[in-house]
Swiss-Prot record:
GO terms for cellular component: chloride channel complex. PROSITE patterns: CBS (PS51371). It is found in: Membrane. Broadly expressed in the plant. PANTHER family: CHLORIDE CHANNEL PROTEIN CLC FAMILY MEMBER, CHLORIDE CHANNEL PROTEIN CLC-A. Pfam families: CBS (PF00571), Voltage_CLC (PF00654). This is Chloride channel protein CLC-a. It is a multi-pass membrane protein. It comes from Arabidopsis thaliana. One of its GO terms (molecular function) is voltage-gated chloride channel activity. InterPro entries: CBS_dom, CBS_dom_sf, Cl-channel/antiporter, Cl-channel_core, Cl_channel_pln, ClC.
Amino acid sequence: MDEDGNLQISNSNYNGEEEGEDPENNTLNQPLLKRHRTLSSTPLALVGAKVSHIESLDYEINENDLFKHDWRSRSKAQVFQYIFLKWTLACLVGLFTGLIATLINLAVENIAGYKLLAVGYYIAQDRFWTGLMVFTGANLGLTLVATVLVVYFAPTAAGPGIPEIKAYLNGIDTPNMFGFTTMMVKIVGSIGAVAAGLDLGKEGPLVHIGSCIASLLGQGGPDNHRIKWRWLRYFNNDRDRRDLITCGSASGVCAAFRSPVGGVLFALEEVATWWRSALLWRTFFSTAVVVVVLRAFIEICNSGKCGLFGSGGLIMFDVSHVEVRYHAADIIPVTLIGVFGGILGSLYNHLLHKVLRLYNLINQKGKIHKVLLSLGVSLFTSVCLFGLPFLAECKPCDPSIDEICPTNGRSGNFKQFNCPNGYYNDLSTLLLTTNDDAVRNIFSSNTPNEFGMVSLWIFFGLYCILGLITFGIATPSGLFLPIILMGSAYGRMLGTAMGSYTNIDQGLYAVLGAASLMAGSMRMTVSLCVIFLELTNNLLLLPITMFVLLIAKTVGDSFNLSIYEIILHLKGLPFLEANPEPWMRNLTVGELNDAKPPVVTLNGVEKVANIVDVLRNTTHNAFPVLDGADQNTGTELHGLILRAHLVKVLKKRWFLNEKRRTEEWEVREKFTPVELAEREDNFDDVAITSSEMQLYVDLHPLTNTTPYTVVQSMSVAKALVLFRSVGLRHLLVVPKIQASGMSPVIGILTRQDLRAYNILQAFPHLDKHKSGKAR
């Protein structure tokens, strides 16, 4: 961090490029493992646009005496309440996500619609300079609102939010990411940014909004106005909140694309680390509720009760009426689309990585620089969208088409702009409209001559530039729609170039181009395939869409990481990948533990003074609890106790005058499982008198007696798979052979210890051939 608290982004290599060779690598006399420095890490990361202190979540079940008693004593009615509440909250997540998505679409379509109508009025009167001033002024005002809200009220609302959601579901606590203020700023900011014509989508923000709704419902509302309903005590834990947020993220994708199955698969393929069949059902239920809500509002809006909205804002690029015909010869252009998508997607990721580093340097200068950067991008975007159509030639209207040509309204495929009657400006049709309508226009079918090649090249080049410079400014933003716009442009260009040599409609080429670029950048296949099928409502596209997605992902993977992985790396979020690096098999957890400070342990019945000293002088979040040695059994590892539980003991002053074990009823009288699940306790709020320092605490009833342990000879690769698969926060390392007088636990590993980048800092010669992607 610098002096102003801004995070300095790491310069470590993110795509595994070769670095300079160390001359010691060729020396046979060097030891196999050369320890360079102590294993260490930073607990800071960017959450949205805010530098935050990062901790891990407790997804593991804490099997202490209280939990076991609570589990045994639950009645059938309580079990039914728990299950019923799970499904009720899943329904409410879908309901509120659908309602808020409709609100956002209504606002965006009406604000942008009236803005474009005003601009069209001045253009029709040949008052182009006035039209430009109105267009630019409105966009600057909307951008200013979105940016100021993010910069000054909720920095965590910046960006799409999907990388932070991935991190949360991976086990990383992202502070303030799902708060009420963040959600409200995300809603209003998304409306402002998208209505301002910025090259941003509302799809990523909707995923974040759905997750915020899920988190708020699970905890009973905002922190200051939380509902104290006793049923909600069942959800006062990280495991159930994780499941709810998974439902929320799937509902957000469904609300963005009206794709219920695609939303479920997106959550499974992209954001969720841990999955099971019961969660699949609830997630699908949430997305089904979203679709019902959206369908109901579409019926209402189609009757003209939503202003300029209609059904336009609820994205549906319907090409179901298009006859899909392709033959063996079409495999060549389809393959080219996939290859182009992979190459351009990886190139886009690489360039965006550089732009985000540059923006980080600008943002470090202060809040006003963040606002000015957003306004500068908005000004550039507005001038380009309004000015570039003057470069296009006017095209005569085709009398054989059924649509009105030319048009001067807010939508339509044939905008007149500066052309005489009977002619239209094809580039204006793509630029002077909302992003959703631009995609509909470029996806239009049975219109082989609607867009000229020059206009498509200008459109493609512009949105490549806008896609790079817009993402990263301090506004809520999504990547889906900008990538769709770029991909559909080069797809349509290829279809236009093929002309009569192909049987596939140019609009379908645009769909395939959009799919290929998304796969080349985001590296998703199954979920994207289903999303595009539900988006276009044409099942006949399935075979060639699958083919294009597989090629694009394969080509993209050969160059660099996916865009969300790159953003995770830039933000410094300690995300654990599913596949360990190959060199991790050459290192054992015992050797890794040797690079850490000695483990801090507590006795089963511990003195208050010792507990206070440990909490004051360490930042560890868990401590092994040992029972004293005797001649027959030696030292026993009783379990693991969390820092939060120690703080609760001190706050409640559950002290003993003598060193003894407590009875079961004594702990139940003082604590409940619900209290132990809360995470708000802070040691700084604890005040212990000098006389209390000499008292004792029995830690046995609050200790997790079944922590996960690994023997010190296990490879780091195997330990990483276990850590990630089970969703752990702490992993105890035990000796292979416990000698007399030796501690039964030799260390604790956390997610920071298992990150490839951190390991290579302590063991720089492990990765001799740079075979992995150190993060």
